[in-house]
Amino acid sequence: YATAVDYNKDAPTTRLFYKKVQNKMHYAVHGHTAAELIVERANAEKEHMGLTTWENAPDGKIVKPDVSIAKNYLKQVELEDMGKLVNSVLDLAERMANRHIPMTMEDWAKRIDIILEAGGDAVLHDAGKVSAEFAKSFAESEFEKYRVIQDKLFSSDFDKFNSLPFDDIKLSLIHISEPTRRS
C-alpha cells in the first residue's frame, strides 16, 4: 500500500486503512475481526490464556502486551492461511508497481475485496461488532486473572537453581568458577 499515490505513513487515514485491511484479512481467515478474535479466544482459564504464541514463547512468561495482539491467538492453519493471503496481495502490489499502474488506497481496498471474493472468502464490509479498545481491555482483564495462575506455575532459572540439592549447587558453582582452558 506504500505504493499508493495517496499514501502518507503519518496520516490518520493511512492507519485507519491498515486497520481495515487487517480486519478484512482476519475475517477472511477465521470469520472474525482482530478485536472479535481476541474477545473470543482470550481466556484466563485456558492453557497459555488461549494464546498460541507470544514474545517469549514457548517457555517464557506471557506479558500484558502479548494478549492484545490478535495474531497471537491464531491456530497454525490460520496463520499459514493468513500468510498466503498477505502474499497474494503483496504479489499483486508488486505486479502493479512493475507496470507503473497508479493506485490509491481506495483502489487497494477494492482490489483486496476482489482477491478475497475470488478465493471464495467472506468479505468484511463494516468494522465488526467489537471495538479494538474493548478487546484490549477485555484481554488485559483476562491477563490479570491469568497472571496469578502463571506466576504459580512458572519457575524461573533462579527458582530451578534454588530447588537443586546442595551438592548439585556446589558442583554447579565449581563448574562456573573453573577457568576456561585454551589449548
Per-range role (PLM):
Residues 1-173, 177, 181:
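Positively charged, phosphate-engaging catalytic surfaces used for nucleic-acid and nucleotide handling
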